[in-house]
Curated annotation (Swiss-Prot):
EC number from the UniProt entry: 3.1.1.45
Family, as annotated: Belongs to the dienelactone hydrolase family.
Catalytic activity entry: 2-(5-oxo-2,5-dihydrofuran-2-ylidene)acetate + H2O = 4-oxohex-2-enedioate + H(+)
Protein name: Putative carboxymethylenebutenolidase
One Gene Ontology term, aspect cellular component: mitochondrion
InterPro entries: AB_hydrolase_fold, Dienelactn_hydro
List of catalytic residues: C130, D191, H223
Residue runs in coiled coils: none
UniProt keyword terms in alphabetical order: Hydrolase
Keyword Kinase recorded: no
Length: 273
């Protein structure tokens, strides 16, 4: 499926301009075609080449993808380089940006989708990697977001996102998710940013609160395994392709199909071989 690319500059309550990149499917002969929406959150480097290609990949499957440049509080929409200086700047901004500003970014992305003529006006999914995985997780606090696929989300277990480094993402998401919302969380067992104890904390908290989720720990996969350049030796194409299967299964089921109202079926499952 062909795609088109553009961007929208949106004013925030912080007196800044949020640039939101838009990747849309294009089907020859069907200029009025409409598609579900996806919010794509980047790493600490803003919308880099790997993030852009990830957005294009999702759009090519028939989704309108919006990708915000999240550091509008401090800089323009340009991407930070994958070097020491870019990493230091990205990590600095990550904990200087108010949590409320992250949430406003998410609201503005949802609002923009509903203004786009190619959006079907129904359901939205979210995804992202690293910092973006956390933001995709937190995006579920907006009930317009039906599902999320979060790649190696950082800082959820440590509660260190945003100004003051004291976020409430895990607590709020685990308590506030609706029956029609769900998520996929994907980590590598060799991820040095989210240790086994941190992964266990996330999984147990979600399970204890009855959240609908899939939790993957991929043997030997490292942090940033989805980044197809400047990954510092961690990119794994085969694992990335496998994980996209989970993403598209969730998006196709939750965003494309009209499931109707949720009905809680407590019928015990039959124990069969």
């Amino acid at each position: 499926m062909l795609i088109t690319e553009t961007f929208h500059d949106v004013q925030t309550s912080y007196g800044t301009t949020l640039r939101i990149y838009v990747y849309s499917p294009k089907i020859a002969g069907y200029p009025q075609a409409k598609f579900p929406g996806v919010i794509l959150y980047s790493e600490i480097y803003q919308v880099t080449g790997p993030v852009r290609r990830f957005g294009q990949r999702i759009a090519s499957e028939g989704y309108v993808v919006v990708a915000p440049a999240i550091y509008h509080n401090f800089m323009g929409p340009e991407a930070l380089p994958y070097d020491v200086q870019g990493t230091d700047i990205g990590n600095e901004y990550k904990i200087k940006k108010p949590l409320e500003s992250y949430d406003e970014d998410n609201k503005l992305c949802c609002d923009l989708l509903f203004q786009l003529p190619q959006f079907d006006g129904k359901r939205i999914g979210s995804t992202g990697m690293c910092l973006g995985g956390h933001l995709a997780f937190r995006a579920l606090l907006d009930k317009r977001v039906t599902c999320a696929t979060c790649f190696f989300p950082t800082d959820i277990h440590s509660r260190t996102l945003g100004l003051g480094q004291n976020d409430n993402s895990l607590e709020r998401v685990s308590k506030e998710l609706g029956n029609n919302q769900e998520m996929v969380l994907i980590f590598g067992t060799a991820d040095t940013h989210v240790d086994p104890q941190g992964r266990d904390l996330i999984r147990k908290t979600l399970r204890d609160h009855g959240v609908k989720f899939t939790f993957l720990e991929i043997l030997a996969a490292q942090h940033a395994f989805i980044r197809d350049e400047f990954s510092k030796g961690r990119f794994d194409s085969a694992i990335t392709q496998s994980c996209l299967g989970f993403l598209f299964e969730q998006f196709n089921r939750k965003l494309r199909i009209d499931l109707g109202e949720f009905v809680d079926d407590n019928t015990p499952l039959e124990h069969v071989c």
